[in-house]
């Protein structure tokens, strides 16, 4: 039977990110993606101006009506949350549909490049820390892993490879989830992802591409979720997600695409088959 995953995050009309990224990725992997939009944006927040509709009041209806319809899920995946209120509504949804058999993957979006996003304050980060602690799998970038663990970003940035590796291993060891992927930092001409799987630690590398584009974390998390829900080992799911993103990043660089538009992943969905 086809696996079914609920994805709780926003959807943007422009910018290949969030639900606009998760829907095609999970679908091509043979997983039914059931979108639960937390907000609707005209364009993702990296643009100079945007308008949005907060869907937080609707999340309670998703929860109650899906329960009424007898919905069961094989996985729940969460991404960008705009407020503590959205986190609380997502928590209620998860409480309603979480079982011992299904997978909860949390992408704890809070910042990047050593800086917390301006829209988030200490209260939100504390709430996200508690929210992510309940997950089976989390996919923070290095900045977010530092926020979750209270680690100074300087303990990682600019340090020697051995120091970075030990910092990553230590952060994974103090975080509650059994499986953790710390995503997408650069080391020389390589891009790296660190994976923690029930205390087993490994770093996977692929060639780096110049530039930075929005939505790559969303694409990675969706591909990872699809593999794990289908019962794949963490290593295989991480490697497939990296193999999928690499040519899309190369195309974005070759075409000179602006970072706010995301990467042209559509032609590379076949890498997920």
Where would I find each of the regions flagged by the language model?
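Short, small-residue alpha-helix embedded
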Residues: 147, 211-234, 238
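Conserved phosphate/ATP/ADP-binding segment of small-molecule kinases
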Residues: 118-201, 235
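Charged C-terminal helix
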Residues: 235-273
């Amino acid at each position: 039977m086809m696996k079914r995953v609920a994805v709780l995050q926003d959807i943007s009309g422009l910018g290949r990110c969030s639900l606009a990224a998760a829907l095609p990725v999970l679908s091509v992997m043979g997983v039914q993606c059931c979108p639960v939009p937390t907000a609707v944006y005209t364009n993702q927040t990296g643009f100079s101006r945007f308008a949005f509709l907060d869907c937080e009041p609707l999340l309670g209806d998703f929860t109650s009506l899906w329960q009424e319809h007898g919905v069961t899920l094989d996985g729940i995946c969460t991404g960008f949350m705009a407020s503590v209120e959205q986190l609380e509504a997502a928590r209620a949804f998860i409480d309603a549909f979480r079982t011992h058999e299904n997978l909860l993957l949390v992408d704890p979006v809070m910042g990047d490049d050593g800086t917390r996003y301006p829209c988030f304050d200490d209260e939100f980060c504390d709430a996200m820390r508690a929210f992510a602690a309940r997950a089976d799998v989390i996919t923070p970038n290095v900045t977010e892993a530092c926020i979750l663990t209270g680690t100074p970003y300087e303990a990682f940035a600019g340090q020697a490879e051995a120091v970075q590796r030990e910092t990553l291993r230590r952060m994974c060891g103090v975080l509650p989830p059994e499986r953790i992927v710390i995503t997408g930092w650069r080391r020389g001409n390589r891009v790296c992802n660190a994976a923690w799987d029930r205390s087993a630690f490994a770093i996977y590398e692929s060639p780096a591409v110049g530039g930075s584009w929005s939505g790559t974390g969303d694409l990675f998390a969706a591909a990872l979720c699809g593999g794990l829900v289908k019962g794949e080992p963490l290593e295989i799911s991480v490697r497939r997600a990296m193999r999928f993103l690499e040519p899309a990043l190369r195309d974005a660089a070759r075409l000179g695409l602006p970072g706010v538009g995301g990467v042209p992943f559509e032609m590379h969905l076949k890498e997920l088959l």
